[in-house]
Amino acid sequence: MPRVKRGFKARRRRNRVLNQTEGYFLGRKNRFRQAVEVLRHAWEYGYISRKLKKRDFRRLWITRINAAARLNGTTYSRLVSGLKKAGIALDRKILSEIAIHDPASFGAVAKLASPAAAK
């Protein structure tokens, strides 16, 4: 089998991988095989975390809305149900932002939702 001299292409490929592992610990930053393995795992974790991020934020928004709703004498589920029945289209992200930054207007929204929830 003839010898294959890859020249600069192999070096370029290795350097591309090793540049991505800059800041990693011990051999993971300067040994090619370890760097490839670590990068592959990092990409997997990144992919998984991008999916989990959406769930985590939704849970955070619901927790914030529930806390603010309880301060206004109702619960999260009653508030969301009342908003839906009243025809108020505010998503959870916006509701949580209102609850944090403008509690008075969140209270007004909760008051609008409470009669609709009672029906």
From Swiss-Prot:
Cysteine-cysteine disulfides: none
One GO CC annotation: ribosome
Keywords assigned by UniProt, alphabetized: Ribonucleoprotein, Ribosomal protein, RNA-binding, rRNA-binding
PANTHER family: 39S RIBOSOMAL PROTEIN L20
Keyword Transmembrane helix: no
Gene3D superfamilies: 6.10.160.10, Ribosomal protein L20 (1.10.1900.20)
GO biological process entries: ribosomal large subunit assembly; translation
Signal peptide range in chain numbering: none
Matches recorded under HAMAP family: Ribosomal_bL20
Main function: Binds directly to 23S ribosomal RNA and is necessary for the in vitro assembly process of the 50S ribosomal subunit. It is not involved in the protein synthesizing functions of that subunit.
Lineage: Bacteria, Pseudomonadati, Myxococcota, Polyangia, Polyangiales
Recorded family membership: Belongs to the bacterial ribosomal protein bL20 family.
InterPro entries: Ribosomal_bL20, RIBOSOMAL_L20_CS, Ribosomal_protein_bL20_C
SUPFAM superfamilies, sorted: Ribosomal protein L20
Gene that produces this protein: rplT
Transmembrane segments: none
Protein name from the UniProt record: Large ribosomal subunit protein bL20
